[in-house]
């Protein structure tokens, strides 16, 4: 500790000299009035010194008592020494009353820096230097040469820089003096802090401030422990920390909420009970959860007050608390009602507050304060932030144990305000949006064919057009037709900008019209006289015509090139799977996490020479996915089949950056059984390869279509068709599943019940059961069959995968059967291989705006507002369910994507129940297609429902099997699983197209 203290005395000397050379002899009486000022502020920029025009949050200015010092070269003004902590930020400012213009020049270590003098409202010259994030490299002399019409001047500042990394100040704590009934206040810090007791005889908030009720004692030991409010405070160069002696006063009315004391494991506990009575005939006791405290964990003191009443206190203490010290501490007296306090022992600190974003709108001069109500332990350090500038934060305790921080110094500026708080264990951020109401301001203009008006204001203004008669200023007749209001735009945290246009042919020429914009703040109007424009001149001169064409042709060529370039760039590769950060309660209050600045973890790197490429699995405009054999990617000496995702050979830097961002996101995402998981990557010495799991059966869409002829509603039908040829496999295991009745994530998988080294902890029967189940799955795949239970299982697995993505704050944005892959055991995995799909020729992707979008799978808010959330993925999941239970029919069959399609979506149109879906499954689809995204189910809810459906299906199958081959036509006959008759045939895809055309 002594070595640290010696090192802490090391100070960096920073001389900032504002130098002015005298050009003429002056006396003390002739010297101008110069004031040197120090302004401390929060860090907002780089560490280099910047002129005063750099925006910062300034604290109260401190006068440095600038005095003249005679030198042979002229007059030098010297200010008091300034101390600033390393990484601190200050502004050194000189105010001088001198006539005429000023010019200045900063010089630092023989290098010139810019200088911008200005004048304040008192016509004083102001020269400032902001020194931000002070470091050792900034030690030295700063010279500022200021020249005025009268003379030149020099001012000297001396700044000491402290190394704050060696400075510490910890919150003080109490300890009982040995063999004495007294408290010792201890605070650890560098430099060594000074300790004082702050005693107050009042219960009011004034105890925290200077006042007549406050008594200060600069000593470490306190013997008088009868005061109303007792605090121990420690102070050093870093600031001030205080700890209050927690007290229950039996003479005070109990609080409306039970007082609560928080401590962390290992901290000391001190809790005081105080009571006053007319005589000494009473006692005090402490109990913890109705059990008296042990001897030696408390001590009692008593004294008589000035009015001869007895004051008695009982202090309970624990030198180092543990979790067993949590509970209700009750102080009882024979003359007073008992009172309790809840002591909570924490493993680490916390900050509890509502983090949802809040939005306010106020008048331009309305008084308003932001406020945050929170509960925290330990005490927080907080700040308010606006426009990258920090403002001081004040916090005040409330009676219910909460604290509140208010910010009123916003000067009615619109924008986003942030409250940031932290303590040793937690961080908290809350965002506010402030809108300032403003009356619209209208600007008008007229052209040959129309008159238009524009306005800005808040709230969004509305428009009216009125006709005036005989050029009278009284315009009362409203113009109902020929008015077109353009969609309003909003400046960032500012006013709404809107416009309205009147078609002159509708109103007639030669009229006086008035356009008015109005909102809750008032109305603003402009009057326009509509002239009658003459006919457009007809071009008769062929020479002029061809000359015009010749001049325009180069511009047309350039325009075509630009359009082609834009068309090429607009379809740039981007991963559909994105991780989002929600910033507020509304659907559009989020942003995509940008992984470009994240570091790539090289533990995922795989030697590219260990890849042996095979066939191309898919190829598109941006790249391709290839099958490959990876040697040693899962286990040394073992090769497995993988899918390798790569860009095309001539990919640009933006596409390469997008692929690297996708790689970093996948490394953060983690592993899940129903996601195509990342296995590794090749990023060094060549093109970027992303190595994923290989799914042998391709995408779910084509898988379903290929199994249409092999689909059976029940396993009973399969038994009959195959003459029970594989039933003996299960005869020895009557409790095992039917082929295809997989428990997909309904029970823990085998690898989760095994040790880390793979040694199973299952019994032999369980192992045999798993082996038989795997054999059943392989035999089922050989039979090339598909059942209703398989469809239900596919839906459940996709919901599980999306539940995982929702937990990871990811949105897929292109959830469809074509983006779900099938592998062994009919396990399905969600993927994003969009770069290997030719979206230019894929009919599922339709041009909308400047992008190709999977319109028929998109939620209304995504389609019309560009908003993508997990709830929009729920809508897409409903479309995916329709694909599954129609065995791969295109959604909205027979309905082309045109203006009528968008109207259908906006009107709430929903597809009919697919042939293979039950009423329950169709109900899930309809729930997913709720127009209001808030009414759609979450993926955990979908997983739970489908899991129950799957379990019921298996249970029904077991009951109907009864250990023998069933003779009934359907194992589902007792639960009405299908909405059609069991014997009916599904309509063909062409027939389904016809049905939808008729109903739409």
Swiss-Prot record:
Reported tissue expression: Hematopoietic stem and progenitor cell-enriched populations. Found in brain, placenta and testis.
Can you list the GO cellular component terms from the UniProt entry? cell surface; endoplasmic reticulum lumen; external side of plasma membrane; plasma membrane
Q: List every stretch annotated Disordered.
A: 45-67, 968-1000
Residues in Protein kinase domain copies:
611-946
Chain positions covered by the region annotation Important for normal regulation of the kinase activity and for maintaining the kinase in an inactive state in the absence of ligand binding: 592-598
User: Has UniProt tagged this entry with the keyword Endoplasmic reticulum?
Assistant: yes
Signal peptide (from-to): 1-27
- Sites where the protein binds ATP: 617-625, 645
Q: Which ranges make up the Extracellular topological domains here?
A: 28-544
Q: What is its main location?
A: membrane
Q: What are the EC numbers?
A: 2.7.10.1
Spell out the subcellular localization from the entry.
Membrane; Endoplasmic reticulum lumen
Keyword Transmembrane on entry: yes
UniProt xrefs under Gene3D superfamilies: Immunoglobulins, Phosphorylase Kinase, domain 1, Transferase(Phosphotransferase) domain 1
Q: Where is the active site?
A: 814
Q: Which residues are recorded with the post-translational modification Phosphoserine?
A: 575, 760, 1000
Q: How is its activity regulated?
A: Present in an inactive conformation in the absence of bound ligand. FLT3LG binding leads to dimerization and activation by autophosphorylation.
Q: Which GO terms describe its molecular function?
A: ATP binding; cytokine receptor activity; phosphatidylinositol 3-kinase binding; protein tyrosine kinase activity; transmembrane receptor protein tyrosine kinase activity; ubiquitin protein ligase binding
Give the free-text PTM comment from the record.
Answer: N-glycosylated, contains complex N-glycans with sialic acid.
What keywords does the record list, in alphabetical order?
ATP-binding, Disulfide bond, Endoplasmic reticulum, Glycoprotein, Immunoglobulin domain, Kinase, Membrane, Nucleotide-binding, Phosphoprotein, Proto-oncogene, Receptor, Signal, Transferase, Transmembrane, Transmembrane helix, Tyrosine-protein kinase, Ubl conjugation
EC class name: transferase
Q: What is this protein called?
A: Receptor-type tyrosine-protein kinase FLT3
